[in-house]
Design a protein with these regions (language model features):
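Non-catalytic terminal accessory segments
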Residues: 189-559
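Short secondary-structure transition/capping segments
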Residues: 16-18, 143-153, 180-195, 319-329
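Acidic, metal/ion-coordinating pockets
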Residues: 1-177
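Binuclear metal-dependent phosphoesterase catalytic core
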Residues: 29, 33-56, 153-243
Length: 559
């Protein structure tokens, strides 16, 4: 189980009452408990541990499912620290329940690196089983990572959002050899590793049934409805805030003013400041058709917009700056003492940053061994500034581009495609496909704002402060900090129109991304993609022949 199932009691209760009975002892929640409404008994949501025998080699596996010490669950949810869990009588008894265990498997929603919960579990198992292999499957921080806790224990974390399929394998239980791969999740890679000639040969009757069912559900929920044609790519992390290609720039300068401000005609004549937490945005928006499905991918949270009317400008204008100084609010459960706990974004961003800068700095300065850089006034490492300056020069100076062709990219065959580039602490190559790292910019604020238009001419002018409901308590706290003449409470807060963070893009797309001939525009984009070497794949069920025919030059088949 992960932290996202635990913020809301109705979700956790649904897991307990419907999901767990279906999966039985295969659903493991070793340290997560629930007290159902109207009861006083705390019980595990799922099973604490299980034992099973593998089909082919008849190995006996003992498995647990562990969550990090998450403290922001709904009332009635308790998560025990793994360091305390391993001291429990039931856990110690489980380690001694049988003398026949070939390997331990721990499915843990916990970071592989930088979290001592794994070490506590490892030490507890080793106190009873000193050499039995332990396979640990981590998560939560969205990165590709691997760590060997000893010669018989590997921990693997496999990215996020099903972008990565993590493959951990072990041979020879007595003297184990571990290996791992981070496989980009797409049918072509699946076919390659299955030894198939073409991805279409993955098609099976059951798979076609599942696909048809999913297509029917998508149609029933109108997920394929096209709201508009996005004219360009907008990036969540690749471009600095303020750049026209940055998603947060699009949001603050265009979407919030055009969609949110206009959603409440009753206050149309009032000057307003709109504030939103950037963490509500989860992915890039790419050029092309923008569908209802894309809306859920990019902005999945349904936060309403609230407002406090008639706030002095000398108070309102300080809010966004101070919010960014304080950092992102990740959950506002009453009584929370660790507001950032449960948030994976900072570690994931650090992973992207390290991959991007390390890759290019190694190519620019292969003799450089410095791993630390003194900060510059902007707060960015000097190496990052130097890299950005070089990349900019290469883009504008033809002679530099010729001297440093590996920095130019963009032409097929000269540079690997963009993707994850991983450096973990396990031996050997982890990434299954060679990539150029995805560009990354540190300059992303935790909070963004659409300023009043025009800006107030005096500090004593008044504005409506509009904000996503997720940050209501933070806004009220700061209003009370900066306005000594007034005490703000939730009684001063009202709902602003009918816009939600989930509906922002669909509304904006219908205002600005609609074309007279949508079908013609989509057809032209398909033709352009085909011309660039990326034709649409044929349907899976159109391929004939033996799916297990010998594979010759398989990687070439997939290009």
């Amino acid at each position: 189980i992960g932290n996202h199932e635990l913020y809301n009691m109705s979700v956790a209760q649904d897991v307990y009452e419907h999901f767990v009975p279906h999966w039985g002892d295969r659903y493991l929640t070793s340290n997560v408990h629930i007290t159902l409404p109207g009861t006083t008994q705390s019980r595990p949501i799922g099973h604490r541990y299980t034992r099973f025998t593998t089909k082919n080699q008849r190995l006996t596996i003992q498995a647990y499912g562990v969550l990090f010490d998450f403290q922001l669950g709904a009332p009635g949810i308790t998560v025990q620290d793994p360091k305390a869990m391993v001291k429990e009588a039931w856990f110690q008894a489980s380690l001694r329940a049988s003398s026949d265990v070939d390997a331990f498997v721990i499915a843990g929603h916990m970071p592989v690196t930088g979290y001592d919960g794994w070490d506590a579990i490892h030490e507890a198992i080793r106190s009873v089983w000193p050499t039995t292999p332990i396979l640990m499957l981590g998560g939560h921080t969205h990165v590709r990572d691997c760590r060997m806790l000893d010669s018989h224990a590997m921990a693997l974390e496999s990215g996020r959002y099903l972008e990565t399929v993590g493959w951990m394998s072990m041979s020879n239980v007595s003297v184990p050899t571990f290996s791992r791969r981070y496989i980009d999740a797409n049918p072509r890679n699946y076919a390659f590793h299955a030894g198939l000639v073409h991805a279409g040969h993955l098609s099976t009757p059951r798979g076609r049934f599942v696909r048809a069912t999913m297509d029917a559900m998508a149609r029933a929920w109108n997920l394929t409805d096209v709201y508009g044609i996005v004219p360009r790519d907008y990036y969540l992390d690749r471009a600095p805030y303020g750049d026209p290609s940055a998603l947060l720039t699009l949001m603050s300068e265009h979407i919030l003013p055009d969609v949110v401000r206009s959603s409440f005609p009753a206050r149309a004549n009032a000057s307003s400041l709109i504030i939103m937490n950037s963490g509500s945005q989860r992915f890039d928006v790419f050029a092309g058709a923008f569908t209802k499905n894309d809306q859920y991918i990019v902005s999945p949270f349904r936060d309403a917009f609230l407002f406090v009317p008639d706030v002095p400008w000398y108070v309102a204008r300080r809010l966004v700056h101070r919010l960014n100084e304080l950092g992102a609010v990740h959950n506002e459960q009453p009584g929370a003492v660790h507001p950032a706990q449960g948030d994976a974004d900072p570690i994931f961003h650090q992973y992207l940053r390290h991959a991007f800068y390390s890759y290019w700095l190694n190519r620019l300065s292969p003799t450089s061994t410095s791993s630390t850089q003194s900060p510059v006034p902007s707060g960015r490492p000097a190496s990052a500034r130097r890299l950005e300056e070089l990349l900019e020069q290469v883009g504008t100076d033809g002679s530099m581009a010729e001297a440093l062709p590996h920095l130019v990219g963009g032409s097929r065959g000269r540079s690997p495609s963009l993707g994850y580039v991983t450096a973990d602490s396990c031996s050997g190559l982890g990434d299954d496909t060679v990539h150029t790292p995805i560009p990354y910019s540190d300059e992303q604020p935790d909070y963004i704002a659409a300023q009043p238009v025009p800006l107030p001419s005096s500090d004593h002018d008044h504005v409506d402060v509009i904000f996503a409901d997720f940050i209501a308590q933070s806004i009220l706290s700061l209003l009370n900090t900066y306005d000594a003449r007034r005490h703000y409470t939730m009684a001063d807060v009202s709902v602003w129109g009918n816009a939600t963070t989930e509906s922002l893009y669909s509304s904006f797309a219908q205002l600005h991304w609609r074309l007279d001939s949508m079908d013609s525009a989509l057809h032209d984009m398909d033709r352009a993609a085909t011309f660039d070497g990326y034709p649409p794949l044929a349907p899976f069920d159109t391929y004939a022949g033996d799916p297990y025919a010998p594979v010759t030059a398989p990687r070439l088949v997939f290009q």
